[in-house]
Amino acid sequence: MHLHYKPNGCLFILQNAIDCARLTGQSIYTIEVFRPVRNIWNRAQEWARAAITPAGLGWMSKYIYQYHRLMLMNLSPREPATHNWPLYNYPPPHILVGYQKLLQICNDYIFDVRAYSRLKYSEQINFGSQLMNWSVMANCSYTINTGAYHRFIDMDNFSDTLTSIQQAILAEKIVADLALIRPMRGFGRTNLDADHDVPVEYLLQEQSKDIGACQERAWGLADRIRVQNAGRKDLVILTTIRKLKTAYFNFFLVKHLPLAPEQELSLPCDCFWLDAFIQKFAESDQAAEIDEALRLQQVPTQTLTKCIISALSLPNCAGTALRGGAFTLRPREGNRAVTESMRRARGEMIEQFVDRLPMRRRRRREVPQPQVAAEEYPSEPEELSFESEVRTAVAETIRLLEEELTVSARNQQFFNFAVNFYEVIQRLEALGDINETTLQRWVMYFFVAEHIATTLNYLNHQIRVSSPFGRYVMLNLAQVVMRARNEDGQIVYSRARNENGNTVLVTSCLALALTWLPQLREQGEEIRAGRDEQFMAEIAYHDNSGDVSEILKQVAVNDADIDSMEISFRFRVTGPVVFSGLREIQNINRRVIRAATLFRQERRPLPALNERVQLPPAQE
């Protein structure tokens, strides 16, 4: 069995019934009976003319077979869906490969509304190739409650407690980003016997749409979804990476906290110090004290943002040098600085650290042997070089761990927006422009950004990365529409971003949110004069994509008016149509077409599915 498809110029071959069954939701037996044929070049005479042209197939699909519904049923011979009109105990003459899987992908997510429209067919004819493709537009949306801030924003005497509220918000977000609170592992048993089913997973997903109901669970949504979908090996790696970032964050934060004096950690501990580093700053009682100090708002906001940006940007460059503490450096050993000893043993230490994790390594990387220089190393401040060495070692460890992740878990471009949000709040703090409006906006758009990133990551993995769906079904267009509404249900603003790829789309959407954050204003205040053209450039405004004055008016609306936000994800996909190579199915299809033609000529409605209809006799 060979199903040929050219989604992007390359020849793809579906070589077995298993892939076809997975993409159609049918059994292998059904596919074997169906005998799928993809390329009908020089074989077109085997099928009725109406069955092999886009117009004819569109008519049959809409009025006779109703493929938009039929493809979701069990089409195995003699199953209830195949009784009488129009199948007569056999599968249909066509199967839309990937259509059922697409609907399953959308159905398995937390969307409130799912709609599928514009099911169309197109033909590709080249020398030696005659193919038919289907395409459909999917529109899936859900609404998140952004107005229920509860303890996040809605507090009395806001102006008197602005600093404490800002620090509380930052502390809660940082706690979620670095998992300083041990997350609940699993949901336990999610359904009970008989009529007492309790949809726990559904209830938890619904709760994540309400920033007030989920409370502290509002933060860290993207990473929670990522961890929940990870396999055992990926879970070990992601947990270790999180511990490394947490330890690194606490290492720099500890000197700013009024904690009780603790015995300082002596390094380099024979230069194999990573395990002690994690135990000290991510797993010990001192880590819990740091967590409590964060909640008690004992750390300056600027320090918090610098530390979290440095930690979350790992393994990339931080951009800001930080000073840490809680380590006692040993004196120079053998006329060599301790940090130089750490640098020389870094590669071997990292390899041994990864090897000790409870997982099977994908490959063994050769440890480069550093060149030994005879001259004395220049005398530089040991504290600074030591802290640089700590970051370099942690960054290289995280980079090596990320290489061990599977492709889906390694795909992180959707989750890199947090650093940008922290940089915005850091910049506003430095300018002294923190007020109720900006804090409210920061919380809301961070919450919205996590939802957009999480959903786009899910769709990207299922539609573009997952095999075999990503090989045979092509994503043509992706669009995100954000509609903010007030308590009366009226639209406060509506913006759409559309691109030809999900990766670019998420960058575009988050850039839009980040651009709106610094627009400081009171309720009803317009964007400052001279800033309108700059703002339109920052949000990548395209000509004829909306009235400029209306967009500026929408931006000037106070975010306190926004009670909910509807997020719609629209995408168009194209997949292959396969024809049945079974002669009996082809003959039944010819008789069904003749019967439908007679019904139309007599101005009678076409029969309903499974209705008893006597077909015309077969023609010789």
Swiss-Prot record:
The modification O-(5'-phospho-DNA)-serine is found at S545. Preterminal protein is used to replicate viral genome, upon genomic encapsidation it is processed first into iTP and finally into TP by adenovirus protease. Heterodimer with the polymerase; this heterodimer binds to bp 9 to 18 of the genome. Interacts with host POU2F1; POU2F1 binds to the auxiliary sequences in the inverted terminal repeats and tethers the pTP-POL heterodimer to the origin DNA thereby participating in the assembly of the pre-initiation complex (POL-TP-DBP-NFIA-POU2F1). Keywords: Covalent protein-DNA linkage, DNA replication, DNA-binding, Host nucleus, Phosphoprotein, Viral DNA replication. GO terms for molecular function: double-stranded DNA binding; single-stranded DNA binding. The lineage of its organism: Viruses, Varidnaviria, Bamfordvirae, Preplasmiviricota, Tectiliviricetes. A motif (Nuclear localization signal) lies at residues 356-365. The gene is PTP. It is found in: Host nucleus matrix. This is Preterminal protein.
